[in-house]
């Protein structure tokens, strides 16, 4: 459904459903919060995806109250991009994985929704805020150069150092011999693969390279190096917005956009963007 908005009443079933949803519900909305888990075969640490150039969406993303915010337009046909093009505030929350119930991701989503409602004065109170925000305009996909059985050693939400071992891939034809996948830079691992079998080019993880604000981020790591997220241990306290440190994660979306399909070829994504540009 999230690749066919705003839909077409004369097209296939999925496009017709999207057309009805857009026409009857979403096009009349002022603010949209789109809740997602990761696709099959991966898991996401809680994060917000938003086009920060949209003033109202920017406000909702910050009000949601989670630490990781990815600044991107969203893929063509997604609800977020369609709403953004229509001038409607829309943010996407990603947390947890498919076919599972992640209590932490659900709790953070619940607090985030309440925060946005408070910021809009729909319900009483003030939105709770994290100690810092990572405002990312770039990331790195870690991909396997080998096919075989995958063993992920570092969970999503971990802060990892340059050269740290993230996963191994073992070819069943060569038992006892494993290929290592190490991170090219330090940063926060916001997504990892969960499927035990990979082929060449399969993404293993999604990394936010962090250079600025290292001391601030490290102070929020637990004993295992996992980022302790706002809302994970109960309703977080209210803070003045001036007390929050905004940390820029600059760069490009290396190896694919944050919203790219899990197995998408980076060249295909580039071709899609070029095709779109030609149509404008």
Predicted regions and their residues:
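Structured catalytic-domain cores with a bias toward divalent-metal coordination
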Residues: 1-280
């Amino acid at each position: 459904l999230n690749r066919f908005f705003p839909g077409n009443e004369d097209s296939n079933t999925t496009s017709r459903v999207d057309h009805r949803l857009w026409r009857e519900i979403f096009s009349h909305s002022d603010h949209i919060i789109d809740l997602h888990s990761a696709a099959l075969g991966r898991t996401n640490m809680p994060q917000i995806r938003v086009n920060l150039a949209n003033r109202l969406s920017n406000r909702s993303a910050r009000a949601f109250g989670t630490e990781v915010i990815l600044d991107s337009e969203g893929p063509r046909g997604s609800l977020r991009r369609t709403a953004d093009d229509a001038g409607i505030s829309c943010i996407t929350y990603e947390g947890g994985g498919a076919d599972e119930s992640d209590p932490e991701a659900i709790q953070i989503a619940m607090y985030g929704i309440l925060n946005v409602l408070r910021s809009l004065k729909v319900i009483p109170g003030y939105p709770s805020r994290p100690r810092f925000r990572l405002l990312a305009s770039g990331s790195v996909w870690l991909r396997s150069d080998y096919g075989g059985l995958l063993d992920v050693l570092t969970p999503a939400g971990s802060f990892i150092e340059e050269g740290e071992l993230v996963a191994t891939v073992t070819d069943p034809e060569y038992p006892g011999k494993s290929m290592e996948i190490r991170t090219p830079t330090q940063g926060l691992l916001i997504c990892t693969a969960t499927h035990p079998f990979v082929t060449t080019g399969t993404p293993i993880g999604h990394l936010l390279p962090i250079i600025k604000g290292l001391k601030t981020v490290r102070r929020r790591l637990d004993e295992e190096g996992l980022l302790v997220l706002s809302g994970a241990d109960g309703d977080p306290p209210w803070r003045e917005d001036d007390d929050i440190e905004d940390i820029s994660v600059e760069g490009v979306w290396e190896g694919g956009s944050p919203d790219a399909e899990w197995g998408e070829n980076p060249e295909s994504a580039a071709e899609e963007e070029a095709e779109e540009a030609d149509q404008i």
